[in-house]
Amino acid sequence: MEPLHKDAETAAAAAAVAAADPRGASSSSGVVVQVREKKGPLRAAIPYMPFPVAVICLFLNTFVPGLGTFVSAFTVLCGARTDLPDRHVCCVFWLNIAAALIQVLTAIVMVGWIMSIFWGMDMVILAISQGYKDQGIPQQL
């Protein structure tokens, strides 16, 4: 009986939307949905680097946890953009250094090593997405 109740709620919601729409209910009216990822300050401090640099940082993070993140901190000082435009460059640099230290200190219990590898993968993903934006090529989802 529960599915019928949900169908009734859906139908009632659709009727309310149609009644509120001054143009009447039209099947061609679309809804634009925007999805935004909420990132914490450490995650948002990952810089958008050129693809080869991001791959090098991934390899460094894979074999020596935190080393690639440490190198990426210096790319911020060289002008790499981050998702923290309102923060000063030095603040973003120190956030990356903090992330590298967390990765090094927790590598003993494997948490830091896994975090370091994921951090490197995020760097490569950001480099690829930035490359698509620079070239104006639409990304496939």
UniProtKB/Swiss-Prot annotation:
It is found in: Membrane. The keyword Transmembrane helix applies. The keyword Transmembrane helix applies. One of its GO terms (cellular component) is membrane. It is a multi-pass membrane protein. Keywords: Membrane, Phosphoprotein, Transmembrane, Transmembrane helix. The chain crosses the membrane at residues 51-71, 87-107. The modification Phosphoserine is found at residue 26. PANTHER family: PROTEIN STUM (PTHR21676), PROTEIN STUM HOMOLOG (PTHR21676:SF1). Belongs to the SPEC3 family. Stum subfamily. Able to rescue the walking impairment phenotype when transfected in mutant flies lacking the stum protein (AC Q9W2E1). This is Protein stum homolog. It comes from Mus musculus. The lineage of its organism: Eukaryota, Metazoa, Chordata, Craniata, Vertebrata.
